[in-house]
Amino acid sequence: LSASLCHVLKDPGAQEYAANQTREEARHVTGFTNYIKARWGSPYPVGPTLGRILEQIVSSDVVYKKIVGMQMMIEGLAMGAFGMAHQDTNDPLLKTLLKYTMSDEAFHHKFGKIWADRTVPKLSEAERYKVEDWSAMIFKDLLYNLVNPWEKKAIYESVGLDHRFVTKAFMEEFDRDSVIREEMMESNNIFRVLCKTLLKANIITKRTKKTYAEFVDMEELNAEDDEVAGIDIANEGLANLERINQSKKVA
């Protein structure tokens, strides 16, 4: 995806940034692959919903789908997920891997926000509607995927559980929408933060805000800042890297 951005972006500086992001993402894949192999054996396959969304973003030649879909939404969710893992894990190696990965990801997410700030106001009404509608659809798909038991089929099977039994029990016991609304009341909820990002970028408008208002108070969001989840961890990683680089400088 990062490599494909080089082909659809027109600004030379943006092309150079996308090329650099490609290198960083390759580093992340290598790091996490080696970590998972060393600690757990092999990774689980990507779930069907997320896999479908990623395939749609990668295969599209439409710039806004790549920027909004990956740089703002997927990268934003990754920052939140990495931040929760960093907080919960007792493994110092994983903490370090997550911290430095998040230092890269924060810039990837910010690139998307800069693009939106500069581009969305210049779109025609028809173009803006396309961006708004597609973003709302992907947001809702990702949001429901958070509490989607079908996504965890491989996990259930790995511990000897019949995924059909677990899914049926889950659907009988949980009110999905209520669970989502309750979780999105937390100020650091990754989807709440993502919603703020889209709102501040004027991708959520009066026309589409009902999709999001079903789960979160939009007036509250408008009064809050839109710092990406986990930015404090990313900044800590950057500070560490600066100290390392300073120590390597030769007079």
What are these regions (language model features)?
Residues 48-72, 88-89, 135-153:
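Acidic/His metal-coordination segments adjacent to aromatic residues that form catalytic metal sites
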Residues 126-251:
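Extended, helix-rich structural scaffolds rather than catalytic motifs
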Residues 21-36, 68-82, 101-112, 116:
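Alpha-helical transition-metal enzyme core signature, strongest for iron centers
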Residues 81, 111-119, 133-140, 144-145:
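An internal, amphipathic alpha-helical element
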Residues 2-59:
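Long, hydrophobic, well-ordered secondary-structure blocks that form the structural core
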Residues 8, 23-24, 104, 136-138:
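A short structural micro-motif
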Residues 5-16, 39-40, 82-100, 114-130, ...:
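Inter-helical turn/loop segments and adjacent helix faces that build the functional surface
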